[in-house]
């Protein structure tokens, strides 16, 4: 298990390096999806369906559940990055990251990769006050700061901290019982991380290519509309700009 953990940590480190990210900073998942040219579509899906991805040659696609919190969406994106860019024998399937119980080996590896990628160990430690780090008694305010800084869900963060032995089992249980959205509100944090969102959002250059084909008169107007409608966009809708 230690060997597997080390290999996953190296893969996450290399992924950051290959994408010009240092080894401690938080990741902007949407910017990275655009940079890596992964066509990404957000749709409301069932609660046990977090997302999935497809890969064929240089073409990459990701489907994400807009009903899940933004923090969980970010974890799902990182999980799918493992399937798209690290896993050799990848086969498309529905994913429910963070639910490793009963999951196959590749899902557990993808979860481990997501944790390493989004919450690098040294990045976490640098954000935790030394006194709290030494006592393994991390304050609620620091917990909230960490999950908002790294843009991850509360459950993903405390699981990572426990896995790194940065909090005790007792504190993990205490933090697990928090009503995190209410707690974040009481501490003055923005609540968008803990809420669903992005329904209908499309990330990627699909629309750019479709528009270019239409502008170059290589496809008809009706074909252009058909392509845009396939990703949930109606170009004829008035945006009401003044």
Language model feature labels by segment:
Residues 1-242:
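Active-site hotspot residues in diverse enzymes, especially metal/ion-binding acidic/histidine motifs
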